[in-house]
Amino acid sequence: RKYMFGRTNKDIIQYAISKEPTPEMVKELADEKEALYRDMCKKDGENCKLAPFAEEFLDYLKNNNIPRTIATMSEKDNVDFYIEHFKLERWFDLDKIVYSDGKIKGKPAPDIYQIAATNLGLTTNDCVVVEDAESGIESARAAGIGKIVAIASMEPIEFYKKIPAVSQIITDFHDFESIISKDLVRVN
């Protein structure tokens, strides 16, 4: 997972084949991988849904005019799929979403969160990031994000407790007011 989540398709393919892939190989394999992924999501609505209480959390952010965006290493086709599938335009300014365009360094580089903060007109220290991937947490730390919240969706809570940059660990968005609080929550 460490070498797969939050990474560019080029990085994932390079890891999988243990050598530098050609641009043609990256395009072909990435297109096939992403099409399969979207197809799986369409067929498995039970498992392809927003995290529990995410809609309430996003409604709260929107209703309170709290700046928000998405910073993902997914490529444009997947971002468009997510926007349509989850109706994300209800909560996000689509022009401010940051995604892998082939120019942004993949996580754990800080670039994606620096760009997201700039798009929102904020400093990275003024931002809260909710992240599930270890590479994304490292990316947020490297960017100087003020508060990093780990959502334990792919790994057990104990995994995130070992990561010093994590300020808070959640399993869903139920307690969303604590998530956006700049008060740091002690991680035991």
Regions found by a protein language model. Name each.
Residues 4-7, 24, 45-52, 73, ...:
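Residues at secondary-structure transition points
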Residues 59, 75-77, 81-188:
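Asp-based, Mg2+/Mn2+-dependent phosphohydrolase catalytic module
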